[in-house]
Amino acid sequence: MHPLAIIVATMFIDDQRYTQSGKLYRRVLLRNSYRVEGKVRHTTLANLSQCSDEEIEAIKLALKHKADLKRLITAEQVKTRQGLSVGAVWVLNQLAKQLGISKALGHSREAKLSLWMVLACVIEQGSRLSATRMAKRHAVCDILQLDSFCEDDLYQAMDWLHDHQQRIEKSLFTHRYAEEGTPQFYLYDVTSSYLEGDHNELGERGYNRDGKKGKKQIVIGLMTDKEGWPICTEVFEGNTNDTATVRNQIKKMAGRFGVNEVTLVGDRGMIKSTQISDLSDEHFHYITAITKVQIEKLIKDGVLQMSFFDEKLCEISHNGIRYILRRNPIRAQEIADVRESKLTKLNKLVAKQNKYLAEHPRAQVEVARKHCLGKSQAMKIDQWATVKTEGRAVCVEVNPDKRDDEARLDGCYVIKTDLSADSASTQTIHSRYKDLAEVEFAFRTMKTTLLEMRGIFVRKANRTRAHVFIIMLAYMLAYRLRRLWYDVELTVEEGIRELASICSIEVISADGQLSYQTIPEPRELGKILLDKTGMSLPDAIPCRNVNVDTRKKLISERKKEKIQALNSKK
């Protein structure tokens, strides 16, 4: 060995178990490991075989932390405190990875902030400001490895998300159908969502579905597969007609997604002659329903007969179009009950008006009649319920023949398609049209229940579109959880709250430094929810000590509101 050679030795515990003469022995040695001319050498410093297990573990622990023995402290020298919420963020993040959402978004800072907005939407609906405040209560920075941010960073991330929406949707589409191949049937429907304020760039007054009269709105289109899995979404100006949104969806399927075989399923009024022509240009097909007026015309022309309508499906082909007919007895009874309910309401109003006329001799009977007539017209029963006067009284005369004529198509519906019988059976056509209920459920979840899209507080068009896209990505997570937890007696919202209640435990040393964060064993319900997802929480998570704070302060805003209120009283 060279006289100036440097030997670096590492001390370790050599703990071995071996069998000799049928007996199990344990040998524990305290040894040094070093290299001489490139070869590993060992020297034994002490034989610890006679030491107790506790003593051996203590020596191992000391060697493991020999560079910082101050961290080896007694139980009396530490204290614990509740840490950040871990369960919901951890599970949703893992689910986002499984569904390809994380991969589609990418690993940039904007991608991670976008992912947090998606997770936050499922955990607790709100604005970008509330999502920033949420990050102070949830271990989002530790789990997503995010640095400090404020609400302005989230708005910038929305701009980024809007610019990358098409790429992300394409990536998710590829991930979803990589193994089973692209589907043939696609469900499409639209809804509207009201806006707060008058300054949204896409906001217009149009056909309102939210019952918010006087408010501007946007129109939202959503396409799913036959199981209701969201594929893409698009936002239009609030006065856009439903049919005007279809052409863009056809272009997406033919261009961006590159699908060759498409059958678009849309409700009556969505797919009309223009849309059918657009679909035909791409060699695509359609499934839709026809209106009551169209049914009556086909009956008048002899194409259909009332006897065809039955509980069992009936199919008629005419001029290359297949018509699938059925009468739903439950729906028929519901319509009949509504009709009778309207007549009852009209009779109550008539009785009220007659009482007023009797108590007020100077009251004009014609005014009362017009009031009742307006009510019947509003309820659309004036064709068979005639409002007239007899002396100083108003009465309702029902025409049984006209009422029966209106009721003859109660519960009847007709689905039409240009698909050949070889491509899809009668039952398949009927089932795919009924699958539109999946899109309706998606809108209901996105707008009113779990995800609460309404009202929208952003102004710019690109951020409005990004907001809706975030909701769609969040619905993917909710969609998956609904199926994973289908046999657990709670809603997805309740399940998320249970997971969010799982918080880390911070272990603080005597010098006030955070040593580590452990995750406690969940309650029984939490265990069940985790088991259903096939996930388990880690024993601990890293602590990055990232400080997240809002630029806009609630206290400052409250003070401003108080000052404004005081000034308004002067």
Name every feature range the model reports, one short phrase each.
Residues 18, 24-25, 32-107:
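DNA- and nucleic-acid-binding/regulatory domain cores of transcription factors and nucleic-acid enzymes
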Residues 2, 9-15, 20-27, 32, ...:
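Anion-binding and metal-coordination hotspots
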Residues 1-11, 58-66:
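Basic/aromatic DNA-contact patch characteristic of tyrosine site-specific recombinases
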